[in-house]
Amino acid sequence: MQNPPSLGLIDQFHRKINYLRLSITDRCDFRCVYCMNEDMQFLPRDEVLSLEESLRLVKIFTSLGVTKLRVTGGEPLVRKNIAWLFEGLGQIEGLKEIVLTTNGSQLAHHAHMLKMSRVKRINISLDSLDPMLFKKITRTGDLDKVMLGIDEAIKEGFSNLKLNTVLMKDVNDHEAMDLVNFAINKKMDISFIEEMPLGAINHKRKDTFISNDEVLKKLQAHFNLIPTTFTSGGPAKYWQIANQSTKIGFISCLLYTSPSPRD
């Protein structure tokens, strides 16, 4: 007698789970002011899943119906032997979409490997186009390396590239229009993310918080934005820029129960 077919993974809201988010490290080569203190203490390495364990888990989840994987961190690309993991992920049958979230600092070095490993989409954090301000926000980041990473990803043929930007009042909110124009020129999408009340930081979030509604109003004064029903499977609400391929997404820090999985 055969066992009945598995229904896969179902959550408490009766949604079928086909999306897995895998954080492979809490370590990062940036110390972004909205994310962590400069003297952040990371987990002991022996408390983090090995790459072999991570790959095995993804295979198990794929056998249970997961078809989309997002690899994140920390900064995933600083993990030692990361190429081995992506090469293994790219060989898993049934895994239809692999997505990477990165700060872009190591992207130039890994872009070809990621393309060969069937990574479909890359989200790149970019909070400023000004090298000095970028350094101030990230504390340790080099804007030139991120720009090189973006260009290398484009050269490798990645067409699903998206920028993620955290705007802060009186810090980088004046760059919203320039960042959108940059995305248009690179034929990328861009999402603006409200500063999240997460982690220990060195400033008061109430002083730097700017709502998506404020950002949207500013952008509508310069761009013809058309509401869309487009979704990448996450919480962003998207607007299409008229006569352009670029879409602008807005991600709120207020969480809600959605019929779709989180991005």
For every predicted segment, state its role.
Residues 2-98:
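Conserved alpha-helical substructure of the radical SAM core
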Residues 40-44, 130-137, 199-203:
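A short acidic, helix-capping loop that chelates divalent metal ions and anchors anionic groups
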Residues 51-70, 78-193:
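Radical SAM/AdoMet-radical enzyme domain recognition
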Residues 169-171, 191-212, 228-242:
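Flexible glycine/acidic-rich beta-alpha junction loops that bind and position SAM and/or redox cofactors
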Residues 211-219:
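Gly/Ser/Thr-rich active-site loops/lids in small-molecule metabolic enzymes
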Residues 219-230:
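Short secondary-structure junctions
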Residues 251-255:
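Immediate flanking context of iron-sulfur cluster ligation sites
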Residues 256-263:
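Conserved small/polar residues in nucleotide/adenosyl-binding loops
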